[in-house]
Amino acid sequence: MLKLFSAFRKNKIWDFNGGIHPPEMKTQSNGTPLRQVPLAQRFVIPLKQHIGAEGELCVSVGDKVLRGQPLTRGRGKMLPVHAPTSGTVTAIAPHSTAHPSALAELSVIIDADGEDCWIPRDGWADYRTRSREELIERIHQFGVAGLGGAGFPTGVKLQGGGDKIETLIINAAECEPYITADDRLMQDCAAQVVEGIRILAHILQPREILIGIEDNKPQAISMLRAVLADSNDISLRVIPTKYPSGGAKQLTYILTGKQVPHGGRSSDIGVLMQNVGTAYAVKRAVIDGEPITERVVTLTGEAIARPGNVWARLGTPVRHLLNDAGFCPSADQMVIMGGPLMGFTLPWLDVPVVKITNCLLAPSANELGEPQEEQSCIRCSACADACPADLLPQQLYWFSKGQQHDKATTHNIADCIECGACAWVCPSNIPLVQYFRQEKAEIAAIRQEEKRAAEAKARFEARQARLEREKAARLERHKSAAVQPAAKDKDAIAAALARVKEKQAQATQPIVIKAGERPDNSAIIAAREARKAQARAKQAELQQTNDAATVADPRKTAVEAAIARAKARKLEQQQANAEPEEQVDPRKAAVEAAIARAKARKLEQQQSNAEPEEQVDPRKAAVEAAIARAKARKLEQQQANAEPEEQVDPRKAAVEAAIARAKARKLEQQQTNAEPEEQVDPRKAAVAAAIARAQAKKAAQQKVVNED
């Protein structure tokens, strides 16, 4: 009984709410085998054919490429694209792609050479000996993405599943009307599809593998059963035909009874789903060593003379495929990429086939019917009854139309699979899916802007924090630099502390004198002498500093000389105004005269050693010479008027006369060496010379008188 219940449970299927049963229209194209299409002359390969960022270009204009050669590098979620045939890269520029608004995206344009040469292919027939990481990396680098319509990178999806996948589901439902690409692929390539499923199972190691297929594909079901006859690891589940049973969440619930939570993924409940075409592409990438360069595309519609399924190279213009199938356009002809419910109308026919292109529908006017005018919503709730995601389409419609993004998000607009069932049953002909697509795009743009604002705020706060840290570090460095003395100050402080400690030690150490011995004061005397020597050295250093400052400043020297002359003049006046009874001592006068002469000589030397740029003024020199001669004359008069008993020493007089003559001669030389532009007056020089000769003659006469 338990075995019977287990078998019943194993084959049980569930049914989801909502859904519709539109005309299938599949017999137009599923009756003929897959066929090849002649190569186009030019291929346009968009760099972004998947969910995620585009890869990095690795070719340049003018490069020769082979079929399967990478055109971009894939890192992370960036999926590479490959050359669909051999030829020459003629341009790398924006081009319209498979998008409702025909947005231009960066594309590589290749002119085919007609040879269709492959790159060297290295297949892994022994893939079971390869590690999981190696297989995932090969699948990713060979450009395999979800071919069921989403275009999510397969390698990233397998990597994200990890070890938590318990059920691997292969989606073979293909529920949308007109599309028969997967049906025909399973009829013609069932063995290769099953081999690709086994590769996926080897990577994921799930507990069960389920193939879900609708009962409107009897030939494909027969082929799969024939291939799976001897295997028990893969279960084929035939489900009732109902749109949209091919949705990921809907098929997961049909086969397992598990519901994917709102905002979650199927991997959250241990389920991973892949499309039939993706499994076939995995087999070719791993075992055959062929990157994805082509896929099966359904060409159908009453405007096509030879409908069917073809192997279309990626990058082939849509116009080329339709012309090969006998396209007979009518007035206002419409071409839809995808199915009638989830597809979109192409703005023009030069867009290329990409990885997510599964159908090209060219309906006639009879198939489309008359266009219906959009009317107001009557709140009939037919859309809510048909919604397979258990949403409220009429409420989402009002929120989308009123730009109420928060309420639309609260009502789980992100869970809308855009199946078009609500628009199919709407009696008011409201294109609900278009409103929902626009609303989701606006919400995504708002979130992207909020993300950028948050990142900018984080960068600003990080910058402010960094500036505060740097400021605090600078203040700390300044504080530590102020607290710690310089190296010289440290040495001086250490020396002073050492001296203080030495003095304290000497003061505290008792002096012991033995009986009969004299105290030894040599240490004290030596210390005293050292202090005296230190004081003398310091005084000499200060004197040298003052002398250097005095010599360096000629103006200061001149001021000091003027002060000395004023002092001498004042002294002479005091001597002249002295009481007559107090006669001037000739010796004292001679000493003062000698001191005055020494001061004058010292000042002259300082002036001569001054900076060369400040030359001696000849007029000042002449004035000083005249003053010196006047002082000498005055001293001689004082000596002559001295007491007769105290006669002047003739030798001193001769010496003084010689000194006076030398000073006069020196002053004449200074005047001669003065600036050439300021010439000495010859009359003044003659007068000075005459005065000097008179002084010398007078001194000689005085000498003779004294001898007599």
From Swiss-Prot:
One of its GO terms (cellular component) is plasma membrane. InterPro entries: 4Fe4S_Fe-S-bd, 4Fe4S_Fe_S_CS, Ion_transpt_RnfC/RsxC, Nuo51_FMN-bd, Nuo51_FMN-bd_sf, RnfC_N, Soluble_ligand-bd. Pfam families: Complex1_51K, Fer4_7, RnfC_N, SLBB. Its cofactor is [4Fe-4S] cluster. Residues 369-397, 407-436 form the 4Fe-4S ferredoxin-type domain. It is a peripheral membrane protein. GO terms for biological process: electron transport chain. Binds 2 [4Fe-4S] clusters per subunit. Belongs to the 4Fe4S bacterial-type ferredoxin family. RnfC subfamily. Part of a membrane-bound complex that couples electron transfer with translocation of ions across the membrane. Required to maintain the reduced state of SoxR. The complex is composed of six subunits: RsxA, RsxB, RsxC, RsxD, RsxE and RsxG. This is Ion-translocating oxidoreductase complex subunit C.
